[in-house]
Amino acid sequence: MCCKAIKLGNARVFPVTTFRDAKKVRWINLLKSGKAKRNKSGKIIKQGEFQSKDVQDARIQPYRRWFSNTRVISQDVLNMFRESFAEKLNDPCKVLLKQNKLPMSLLMEPTKTRKANIIDIEPFDDTFGKKSXRKRAKLYASSIENLSNFAFESYENYIKKNSEYENVDKNIQKSFEAIFSKGTSKRIWNELYKXIDSSDVIIQLLDARNPLGTRCKHVEEYLKKEKPHKHMILLLNKCDLIPTWCTREWIKQLSKEYPTLAFHASINNPFGKGSLIQLLRQFSKLHSNRRQISVGFIGYPNTGKSSVINTLRSKKVCNTAPIPGETKVWQYVRMTSKIFMIDCPGIVPPNSNDSETEIIIKGALRIEKVSNPEQYIHAILNLCETKHLERTYQISGWENDSTKFIELLARKTGKLLKGGEVDESSIAKMVINDFIRGKIPWFIAPAQENDPSNIKLSNNTLVEKNHLTTLDDEIYNDANPNA
């Protein structure tokens, strides 16, 4: 309660009082409420707050909703859903909305074969009867035909997993330099899986000059098997280095599997920026229940992942360099209030069939650290047109001889050692860098479906000169503005 002051002369004196106001009383009761009252023997006489074990009788609400099926679907509707779902399942441009509202366990066809009936494998009399034999082998099939099919499938899977050991002498092992193991370390793969786990949409960057060679099939199979709910986009970067018809054909073929876009990473003069932003906003609307989505950029080294992020932000937010391995760790970059981007280091998927030449041509290594680079010049001469090399370096007459080509170019540029010897290593590194950075026009043409003479390219196949389509002068001038 409130106490009033008493005026005695010129002084105001507050009387001494022991009364407590209501707030103080509630505070004291709160402190005492958690303790139980005990007698002299220590037994609890009165329980404290939340210590009582007495429970009131409860009963279920008499409501029909608690005792009936929550969701019911007829067989006809289920068949309709199953047919429509099977038609749209492999369409890369279709996305399933509200997956939790559908009986996915009934719609999805079981991929695994059902196990054989246990009674057919182990009869009751042979297991628990007088003739019981508990040590008999447990077979995975109920008949000889099923057993032979199971053995054949197991053999095919074994051959598929161990295909790298086919036609290889066990006593001979390939010896690679330490530099060729870059991009395959455990740390790099940990960074990749961090970015994949944190991303809702994954953009795989491909070099438009060699899309199949810079494609990570291992990551695609991992996403299909382990994380089918994540969205994948293929981005053909460096499309300014190849003709328009070639870009159109690659997009036509790759769009059958994933949404594919053409892109040219440039802060001042980009191409495909609006289409990519619009596509990411569509994915953001699909996840309207989230505050934001994350977009991860993965791919081979030197495919332009950081450059694409800088292009989308219209300023430099990630360090870039024309050499592979510039990005060491993953990093978050904000694009909009609802879209975040994740930059990831480049990875080189393991492939036992890849040779040293193929790894270098894909641009996955730093050429200055490679020993004897002149041995890879012959493959570059096969991939590039002769007239483009002549126009780039102003030399001619090497007749597809890599040694003579290096000698002519060294004397043209003046890169000679003591005694007038040719500096083959410096010339080879210069040519390989020009080849990777687009100063020498080249590209791998997509296989035409109607032309049987074309050879379908794979990840580990180098194309000879006669399989390439001649570049036009327009592409050459774009790649060499000073020529």
From Swiss-Prot:
PROSITE patterns: G_CP. One of its GO terms (molecular function) is GTP binding. CDD domains: NGP_1. InterPro entries: G_CP_dom (IPR030378), GNL2_CP_dom (IPR024929), GTP-bd (IPR006073), GTP-bd_ortho_bundle_sf (IPR023179), NOG2_N_dom (IPR012971), P-loop_NTPase (IPR027417), TRAFAC_YlqF/YawG_RiboMat (IPR050755). It comes from the Eukaryota. Keywords: GTP-binding, Nucleotide-binding, Nucleus, Ribosome biogenesis. The keyword GTP-binding applies. The keyword Electron transport does not apply. GO terms for biological process: ribosome biogenesis. GTP binds at G299, Y300, P301, N302, T303, G304, K305, S306, D343, C344, P345, G346, I347. Residues 189-350 form the CP-type G domain. Its main location: nucleus. One of its GO terms (cellular component) is nucleolus. It holds the Pfam family NGP1NT. It is found in: Nucleus, Nucleolus. Belongs to the TRAFAC class YlqF/YawG GTPase family. NOG2 subfamily. GTPase that associates with pre-60S ribosomal subunits in the nucleolus and is required for their nuclear export and maturation. This is Nucleolar GTP-binding protein 2. It comes from Pneumocystis carinii. The gene is NOG2.
